[in-house]
Amino acid sequence: MEPIHNPPPQTCSYSRSSTTYTSFKDASCDTKVIRIIIALFLIVISCGLILCAYTFRDLLDADYLAQEGPQQATKLLQQLDDVLTGPPLPIWDNEHLFQFSCLMQNKHKRVLPIDICNPLTKFNFLECICNCLMTKQSVNVNETDMCELFCPPTCTPENYRRLLCTSSVFPFVMWHDPSADTQEAMLTKMDQTMSSGRVGNSHWVLVIVDIEYRCVTFFDSLCDYVASPQQMREQLEGLAVSLGAIYPKEGGADSDQEELLSPFQVRIGSTVKVQSPGEFTCGAWCCQFLAWYLENPDFDLEEKVPKNPSERRALLADFISTTEQAMSRYSSLSWPTTD
């Protein structure tokens, strides 16, 4: 028998020329143009995705109603324009808040600088504010000994006592991170934020207690980041009652006791967002609000702040540039003296 010769199995093969790749240097002119166009297209898409992620939290916060479609579209376009206009504004943190409050004390005299060594949060701010005002009251009537007086590390007890006696406007800043649900968690988050050097979700808000005006004013540049305006008002009304008892109205012997112990007024400084999306300007806005308040406690924020995002940004940028140099004299964090 003759051996059977089976044909070799057929295999599928592809032309090598169809998978040949050339470097950009050796490619033809048409190929180079196509590759450049593709690269530019991918860059544009990547930038768009980054921008979307950058303002994603603000997009989630927007109220989308069918009947308000055009208004919402205009609002988002304004936010986009605000983010893309000019270089980012500087971030003002606790040391800047202290320096600016010292600048205001030097100008107005009745302002107590902000104690940044005693961090306030939504969990302890009511107690801390009451303690500070009670300390002032006891100092005024000479009930507090120098040894018992708690004062910031960068201020002497004698100087702090004098500042307390001459102050009637007390600004307090509150630090907030929405991910912390207890005081311990908030302080831990604060330490982590300071160590990382990143802002994250942290935010500054301002509380002003004015003894002469008998008013408590709350300001949040994002309007409702810590709590809704109504929720904050309810908390501050409890503080206002306590302050009314600490600092009763002046009256004669025949004055009604209930009237003398009437609560302080409560004001919510902003019911609209003045801080632009994508910017970390809460600290600077707190300082700007304090400056306006000291000029006129009855001022209307919405009359001061432009509705146009670009104009609003320009206003804050001008405020920052005109005050940073003057603030630098307090860069050592030493408290101003009353001498």
UniProtKB/Swiss-Prot annotation:
Topology with respect to the bilayer: Single-pass membrane protein
Biological-process GO terms, alphabetical: protein deneddylation; protein deubiquitination; proteolysis
SUPFAM superfamilies given in the database record: Cysteine proteinases
Segments passing through the bilayer: 36-56
InterPro entries tied to this protein: Papain-like_cys_pep_sf, Peptidase_C48_C
Superkingdom, natural source: Bacteria
Main location: secreted
Top enzyme category: hydrolase
Entry GO terms, CC: extracellular region; host cell; membrane
Record-given protein name: Deubiquitinase and deneddylase Dub2
Species for this entry: Chlamydia trachomatis serovar L2b (strain UCH-1/proctitis)
Upper taxonomic lineage: Bacteria, Pseudomonadati, Chlamydiota, Chlamydiia, Chlamydiales
